[in-house]
């Protein structure tokens, strides 16, 4: 089964994140919500708190075929500031694996080259 990871930073856009999770799960794709904070509970840009499936340091990146970034402000800048995620994105891109982003989040890719 395909495996995807979507990353949550404080201020993520709730609709963008949950829509991706919902659609992929309906399609039979295994997707985990991954917190890049030290807490599994992450609050979005509209003060809705979601409990992530896993913290970044516990996520199994080797099993994933796709890394996905939701948009949102300040979520996008917070994702961009998380160095371990940026390194994983660069590695995935170099390996030809799927990296995807919604709305404001493609700006993360533009700064990674």
Indicate where each model-derived feature is located.
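Short, thiol/selenol-centered motifs that function as redox-active sites or metal-ligating centers
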Residues: 102-103
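Extended, subdomain-level signal for the structured scaffold at the beginning of enzyme domains
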Residues: 1-95, 107-111
């Amino acid at each position: 089964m395909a495996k995807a990871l979507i990353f949550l930073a404080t201020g993520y856009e709730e609709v963008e994140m949950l829509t991706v999770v919902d659609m992929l799960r309906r399609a039979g794709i295994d997707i985990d919500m991954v917190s890049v904070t030290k807490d599994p509970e992450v609050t979005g840009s509209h003060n809705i708190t979601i409990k992530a499936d896993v913290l970044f340091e516990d996520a199994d990146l080797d099993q994933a075929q796709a890394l996905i970034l939701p948009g949102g402000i300040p979520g996008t800048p917070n994702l961009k500031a998380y160095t371990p995620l940026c390194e994983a994105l660069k590695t995935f891109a170099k390996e030809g694996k799927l990296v995807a982003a919604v709305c404001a989040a493609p700006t993360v890719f533009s700064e990674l080259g």
